[in-house]
Amino acid sequence: MPDVIGIDHTYVTVSDLARSERFYDVVMAVLGFRKNRFQIDGEPHVQYYNRHFGYVLRPQHTSAPHDPYAPGLHHLALRVNTAGEVKDAAHRLAERGIPASDPKQYPEYASDYFAVFFSDPDGLRLEITNYRQERRERHDNWKNLEP
């Protein structure tokens, strides 16, 4: 059976590529991503990438607004290692003018769940969260867990 070893890339369709690129230039730089540009069928694309995956912006074809409660993507959570790194990212976003929630613990999700939430220019909800103990245990022992 094939073994999925990670998420290779995510494509996000945006209403204004230049506006979204300015936003993601800040967010992804805070998180250590690099950037390149390319075209597919004459359409410009902007890709942010690190050693784990690529996050690609592409221009919209229709003008329907994003609705996180319609079928499709609700939000994207990017994981950093520690709660301290969540706080650092939130601080850096605030310094660069990106509005976000206060970084804090969310015990209703998990006892060590720490996160900051914000939205991109099209309303796509984004989260930066820590690598929680429950996740570490699941990742380390996934073959022994019940399917």
Q: What is each model feature region?
A:
Residues 50-88, 95:
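Long, continuous compositionally biased terminal/linker segments
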Residues 1-21, 76, 132-147:
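N-terminal beta-strand motif that seeds the catalytic metal site of vicinal oxygen chelate
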Residues 11-55:
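Core segments of cupin and vicinal oxygen chelate
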Residues 125:
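Glycine-rich acetyl-CoA-binding "A-motif" of GNAT/NAT acetyltransferases
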